[in-house]
Amino acid sequence: MPPMELGKTKNVHIVGIGGAGMSAIAELLLKSGFAVSGSDLASGEVIDKLRELGAVIHQGHQAENVGASDVVVYSSAVRPESNVEILAAQKLGIPVIKRDEMLGELMRHKSGICVSGTHGKTTTTAMVATMLLEAGQSPTVMIGGVSDYLKGSTVVGEGKSMVIEADEYDRAFLKLTPTIAVLNSLESEHMDTYGTMDNLRDCFAEFANKVPFYGRVICCVDWPEIRRIIPRLNRRYTTFGIEEHADVMASEIEPGDGGSTFTVEAFGERYPGVRLNVPGRHNVLNALAAFSVGLEIGLPPERIIAGLARYSGMRRRFQVKYRGADGVLVIDDYAHHPTEVKATVRAARDGWKEHRIVAVFQPHLYSRTAEFAGEFGWALSRADTVYVAGIYPSREKAEDYPGITGELVAEASRTAGAKNVWFTEEHEALLAALQEEAAPETLFLFMGAGDITHLAARFAAWCTEMRSNADATAS
């Protein structure tokens, strides 16, 4: 593949470079030969990796950071009217664009495979990427998460395909140019952007119809809202699902060994013995989306099946942080919507039937907690024990949401029938409580999009230390 070009642009400055989507685009630009600088309020592993790749990153926002940039890129999380770097760039006449516009430009000379949906985007995008790489297709890839298989969030390939996670937040995906558009799931989310479900549905329909006449839309018919969009499509489409009749379906699903084995039925053909090494029925559904993409681009079914078998998961997507000989498991997952929490708890319950499930959930955003407290409580109630942490505010402020705390979720879980439910605002107290819970055949399931991941890492480290001490004593 020739180097990506953006006219005479060579120096790109990224405001908020440490965010999942922004760090991925920074990584892609660096690997494509651009000089990248950036700024972020936080530091950490992602920032360290970008520096290793050659990025110049400043902690905090300062006007002088924009320097000799040819363009300044920012995300939906940044307020352009008050950010000093954006204001400085505008004063200097430097173009200022949003992340999705930059991504759309990078896609211009590629055949885009864009995976959208309120759930499963990251996993499905990574499955498609793994499948294409295993088939020797050499795609360019950009995912809003970290894959050990990809050794990061991006791949710059020589092939014609570009596999992209298409984010619906702030209507970002409407800047993309898909040749294949995957509608993986759809339900109420990001109402701060859309206001109504009708608006969200309209936006997904607009995204799907951006596919050219020679492209295809891949639709999950297990989601009622996607079934409502299908009659509005003016492009060819393939359907997939488990619960509903579809062009591509899964049957004979057998969970076990941390994953699932199942049969794919596609356009009248049967493909038994498909193996997926990540747990959960929701991941079987994600695999069907990838299978449908593979068929559309002409991959032999055996190559598709081999690629799916090689998929090993994403960081923070049912990621095993600790596995003890006594059956103790520590899992870290990004689930932060009731549907995701329900699917993740079910995956734990189905995959480890003999284990006691201890769910540790950190609500993300006051607005989301206020809207979905009841649904979160019900989703968590299938666990044997539930711990709810304090809300991770992200871009929101507590004073704007009086009375909204994690206790709402805890109380909803009790109402849904959970017997052992605790709300603990402070992480130190929560860590101490979890240490008391540690016992053989216990699965600790940490869920949330905030800093609960750090608590999962600390608890996993404590489990490792306890095991080492026990081994030393025994010897």
Swiss-Prot record:
GO terms for biological process: cell division; cell wall organization; peptidoglycan biosynthetic process; regulation of cell shape. It is an enzyme of class 6 (ligase). GO terms for molecular function: ATP binding; UDP-N-acetylmuramate-L-alanine ligase activity. Pathway: Cell wall biogenesis; peptidoglycan biosynthesis. One of its GO terms (cellular component) is cytoplasm. ATP binds at G117, T118, H119, G120, K121, T122, T123. It catalyses: UDP-N-acetyl-alpha-D-muramate + L-alanine + ATP = UDP-N-acetyl-alpha-D-muramoyl-L-alanine + ADP + phosphate + H(+). Keywords: ATP-binding, Cell cycle, Cell division, Cell shape, Cell wall biogenesis/degradation, Cytoplasm, Ligase, Nucleotide-binding, Peptidoglycan synthesis. This is UDP-N-acetylmuramate--L-alanine ligase. It comes from Chlorobaculum tepidum (strain ATCC 49652 / DSM 12025 / NBRC 103806 / TLS) (Chlorobium tepidum). The gene is murC.
